[in-house]
Swiss-Prot record:
It comes from Streptococcus gordonii (strain Challis / ATCC 35105 / BCRC 15272 / CH1 / DL1 / V288). This is Ornithine carbamoyltransferase, catabolic. Reversibly catalyzes the transfer of the carbamoyl group from carbamoyl phosphate (CP) to the N(epsilon) atom of ornithine (ORN) to produce L-citrulline. Coiled coil: none annotated. Its EC number is 2.1.3.3. It comes from the Bacteria. GO terms for biological process: arginine biosynthetic process via ornithine; arginine catabolic process to ornithine; citrulline biosynthetic process; L-arginine biosynthetic process. L-ornithine binds at residues 168, 232, 236-237. GO terms for cellular component: cytoplasm. Keywords: Arginine metabolism, Cytoplasm, Transferase. Belongs to the aspartate/ornithine carbamoyltransferase superfamily. OTCase family. Pathway: Amino-acid degradation; L-arginine degradation via ADI pathway; carbamoyl phosphate from L-arginine: step 2/2.
Amino acid sequence: MTNSVFQGRSFLAEKDFTRAELEYLIGLSAHLKDLKKRNIEHRYLAGKNIALLFEKTSTRTRAAFTTAAIDLGAHPEYLGANDIQLGKKESTEDTAKVLGRMFDGIEFRGFSQRMVEELAEFSGVPVWNGLTDEWHPTQMLADYLTVQENFGRLEGLTLVYCGDGRNNVANSLLVTGAILGVNVHIFSPKELFPEQEIVELAEGFAKESGAHILITEDADEAVKGADVLYTDVWVSMGEEDKFAERVALLKPYQVNMDLVKKADNEDLIFLHCLPAFHDTNTVYGKDVAEKFGVEEMEVTDEVFRSKYARHFDQAENRMHTIKAVMAATLGNLYIPKV
């Protein structure tokens, strides 16, 4: 019999966890953050080996998993797209069975949700989803921890996601918010509304938590009562060929100071999972400006650098929340119930 409700479990999608479990992980994240700030060791994974599989590139996810693993006393091993043969020269099942005999836990960041599920099914060790095309669960813990840090609560708050309403971040914000009792508004063009299956899943959780779900094209309706404005890139990895179409579609959904003022809330915060294209100080930004005449994309530089911005706190919280997930599922902690 295990002493923890989390021990040995994988973290593949938020919908697999109860409200109490997600709240516990957010609370554990805050505790581990405090230990880190006070330089108190918390080596719950001493002697463990962690595989970091990256089919998609990353800055924050890789850095967060690496530093979190080291803080916990584990050894992280990075395996990039050129190091792994998932589904190419070797099946995901076979790869999972090999890695599960060498590593104590596996992180996967890539395209297919089915692939991360197969890793969990066949490896025999906890697997953590660092991002797939469908879900971004580790990001959600960081997002909602950041919201809780700013407001002291989650239930009853209103978060508005602006932009591509059918990407992984929008899916995860919608479902996780519904589980946690957060009102989630998706402000998006109809062409990019979330899939009906995702909306119905969120609505089911919202009935239990009392959260309100809204999907709309109307800016005034979307930001009414907003506590949090959130956006993400207009073009997700693997969709670069749709750039012109997305820029044209999503210009009206940019987070700018006019939208902030519509919310009429001095306590409002702005979140972004990063990277953000808010100026032309990158090769990418310059290229977009030259091709499409847009110098600021999903968020203006004014909002990005404003008093409302909390995205760098949010980015730091990736490390603390990922650490909590790894410790809870692999660290033999005493968590008999939540």
